[in-house]
């Protein structure tokens, strides 16, 4: 799956056509149905405007919201999105009461002069995800013929298909892979994600550094394994580092996080790093806590003495930060996935903040810095530096699967140039 040769919305003639766009309007709503963070709606505006500015007959938007589990549930209606969307677009938006069916087709086919239509939640139909779960976790599979019918129903609403929902690209859902139109293009959000991940995974400027944090080694084995084929240097930080330190250096780690399952793969990963000539950087000092709490008492532990029993490492210390900065200074391409400590607690946010400051500085000096979604994107938002980095991915699960070397169904489904 090449990321850099996919058809983009700018390659497609939309004049006089119905443009069906899969957006990600899965926004947080409070109990009064007010949107608490409209970022995802704002993110889709350039793609929608491009279609309108280039003479689209109509723009039809489809999305999911929450997890209604294949049934209609007013709590998850997309209707509350309409006012915000109208405000950001500066034009009226028609809300369709469903996402498929004769009534919806009539609304869509009547629309012209660049009308914008928002369809109701795709996941009100079990055929979108292909299955649903009840409260006990029992799965019901969708009927194959009905899934086909649902996909035909979506296909009937457009002449050109555009996917701008990178965050759902790792899901083989009907709206991601089942729309059967001759041209299936990436929107601007999707295109930016693919371009930057191609810069890292297909043609990085070297030296290429990956910074991997987070809690469990076992969650990141595939990620580490895939990146060892691509990077020059790998910083392993966060809770995951303690498992490496204990296995490799027999360091006393006290009550710090230890991942027994992940520990078994550490020697194999380190062996691969040696074979591939990848330098692994681990922390050498730690900010410790007497309990997992924002108000915990703190201490400092080093490689020499280890972490005493009853204490746990929740962040890295100044010596480690120096090592990280050296690696960041040397690199030309930096990919960061997973914080360096428990940044949610102010006392243990120092390592993550210092790492962030160093990559922001690097970006200012021309380095390519990519933040791989999830917690690390939260860190960039917390300190308000998203616009000071080359790219902050919007897809937690999708970016992780891409970095693990997996094919993303929603990307594979797009037309190639």
From Swiss-Prot:
Cellular component aspect of the GO annotation: cytosol; mitochondrion
Group of enzyme by EC: transferase
Residues binding (2R)-3-phosphoglycerate: 23-26, 39-40, 63-64, 66-67, 122-123, 170-171
One of the Pfam families matching this protein, by short name: PGK
The UniProt record lists the keyword Membrane: no
Catalytic activity, EC: 2.7.2.3
Cellular location(s): Cytoplasm; Mitochondrion
InterPro entries the UniProt entry points to: Phosphoglycerate_kinase (IPR001576), Phosphoglycerate_kinase_CS (IPR015911), Phosphoglycerate_kinase_N (IPR015824), Phosphoglycerate_kinase_sf (IPR036043)
Binding site for AMP: 215-216, 220, 239, 313, 344
Pathway per the UniProt entry: Carbohydrate degradation; glycolysis; pyruvate from D-glyceraldehyde 3-phosphate: step 2/5
Top-level taxon of origin: Eukaryota
Binding residues for ATP: 215, 220, 239, 313, 344, 375-376
Summary of subunit composition and partner proteins: Monomer.
Protein name (record): Phosphoglycerate kinase
Species whose genome carries this gene: Hypocrea rufa (Trichoderma viride)
